Amino acid sequence: MRSVLPFRALTVAFACILGLAMFPLGTGAQEVDMNRYITLTVKKGATIVLSLSGPENNTPVRIVSGETDFTTSVDTTVGVIQRRIDAKASTLTIYGRVQCFDCSKNGENITALDGSHNGLLTMLGCYENQLTSLNVRHNERLTVLNCSSNQLTSLDVSHNERLTALVCYENRLTSLDVSHNELLTMLACYENQLTSLNISHNELLTTLACYENQLTSLNVSHNTQLYGINCSKNRISSLDVSRNTMLEDLTCNSNRLTALDLRNNPELKSLDCAANQLSALNLRNNPHLNMLYCYANRLTSLDVSRNTMLEGLLGHSNRLTSLDVSHNRELKALDCANNRITALDLRNNPNLSILFCFNNLLTSLDVSRNTMLEGLACHNNQIVSLNLRHNQALAQLHCSNNRITSLDVSHNSELQTLDCFGNQLTALDVSKNSQLTVALCWGNRLSTDAWNRFFCSLPDRSYMPNEQIIYPLDNRSDSQKPQVLAANGNIAKRKGWEVSYYNDGQDTPITGFTGSYQCTKIYK
């Protein structure tokens, strides 16, 4: 459901670009250029996997590591052929006119890379290793660098002025100077230890991922070409995106924002501003908004009437007393749980498949128009009745801790989880729920006879490899215990059901059933 920023996929695209090694049998008439070479610090005895390409077909290269010493040739063709090399020493050197070089995913077998003696390099991939140092100071032709998922504490790209894509996430960088990389269009430096990031000289940036650092501020006013920003999980207290009019995807969750002005972002499609300190959010100028994550803020109201393309709204854990989604006919997922909402009108949301509205003040809930509903969590409200006749796709139902006196699930043949504890039910029939695997139903008002009929209505699971489970009681003092123990719980056990006390994952099987009730044919 959640949108994926372009820079999330760029690492995969980069790997495809760099999977271009071709190793023909012949070396041609050319000689290896021994003045150009790349040196790796490797684990002696390890097998190193490389991919290479040259500026022309049949470019000769020589690979040396102790006793390993051979010459081969590479092409310009982008391919998927890789070369496996046995490291016979602690260094591995690749001589020749190598233009694209990829030594990624060798893990602890590569700890350092020096490409400074090969000025022809245009693309370098060395991600998912254990690099502690990387020297690209003399690689002035470099346009793409992916050194992510290593152990780098510093990275000097000041001499790589042609760089257009820099991917250096998941390292230990405390600083990053990209002031000399004015051609940069994509920067992914997330999951480092950066305390500041100056991108004022990178006016061509289109995607920026700097999340999970220690940034206290971020100035994107010079980056008017940006369409994707992810600066989440930092310490940013203010964010000005008024000049980023092309912005489509903004993820700034888990910061310290108290305000967010989106009036100049008409192209915005996905917004994640969750887990901040926002008390207001104006979305009237964002007609293309498709996904909204604004949960865990301090919102007292939320107007989404202009966001008619909205498919996902996650606004739980705020201070909302009402929520109007009558203009959001495309809505598929709504999470407004943990608020103070007293009423919820869902008649104009025919595409709704997920609804979380638990922990509110609802006294009623009409889902009769939501025929595509698959998951419903409305527990911890004050609902007195729940009509599920029209929700035939419903698979997950959580309606516990309400005031429901009867519950008809006979039309919900896809139901897998039934969570209805803490209500006022006097009967429960699941004979039509052939997919049911979990039932939490303690704390109701079922008599012993009603428990017997419930056990009889359970679908037969004796043929399944894993036991299904029902919870007629919880581990605390339960007033229903005498009625449950007087029933014949062995009926459920013979059908392959585990009958347990609910105890937050440390369930204890219920023993001591004294009933001898036998099911009638209607339940067989």
Region annotations inferred by a language model:
Residues 118-120, 139-142, 160-163, 181-184, ...:
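Leucine-rich repeat
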Residues 132-133, 152-154, 173-175, 179, ...:
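Long, intrinsically disordered low-complexity tandem-repeat segments
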Residues 101-103, 124-126, 145-147, 166-168, ...:
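Conserved hydrophobic beta-strand positions in leucine-rich repeat
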Residues 145, 157, 178, 199, ...:
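Non-core capping and flanking segments associated with repeat-based/extracellular domains
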Residues 101-131, 138-140, 148-149, 159:
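Right-handed parallel beta-helix
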Residues 2-11, 17-120, 224, 243, ...:
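N-terminal capping/linker segments that flank leucine-rich repeat
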